[in-house]
Amino acid sequence: GRGRRWGQQPYMSPYQQPYRQVVPGVVRAAAPVDVPQGINSPISYVFARAPYFALVDVRGGKVVNVQVLPNQYAMGGGGVGIAVAQWLLSMGVTVVLGPPLGPKASALLQQAGVRMVPAQPGTPLGEALKIAGIA
């Protein structure tokens, strides 16, 4: 056989977009979305291979910032779920909304204390935040 380490590696961009750190009192939520329409972006049917991720900062139940970033791992090989989970953790995400995650990405986020909230695919991001009780 080819051995364990000969499979495709996930795509790793050397130029990940910088994003400001979370300030105290702010909850940062992330959600995979299909199109970059800010708070109106629909939740994607897939997690790790969604074309975009929306990062939402919420303070006191009010949305204070929304940014939709392209998912640089969407076209990667195997192991994309782990790469996306690590990327979200590096952004300071504490809540993930969206469809079911793969077992490895889910385990990594749970170990890091990230709350995972199921969200119906196609639901606008703002509505999903309200349903989850975040905003």
Task: State where each predicted segment sits.
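Extracellular/periplasmic low-complexity linear segments
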Residues: 1-27, 49, 54, 73-84, ...
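Short secondary-structure boundary segments
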Residues: 33, 99-100, 121
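Short, well-ordered secondary-structure micro-motifs
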Residues: 40-44, 66, 108, 121, ...
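Short acidic, glycine/proline-enriched helix-loop-strand junctions
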Residues: 61, 91, 103-126
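Compact, charge-rich alpha-helical regulatory domains located at protein termini
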Residues: 66-95, 114
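Short Gly/Pro-enriched loop/turn and capping motifs at secondary-structure junctions
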Residues: 75, 101-104
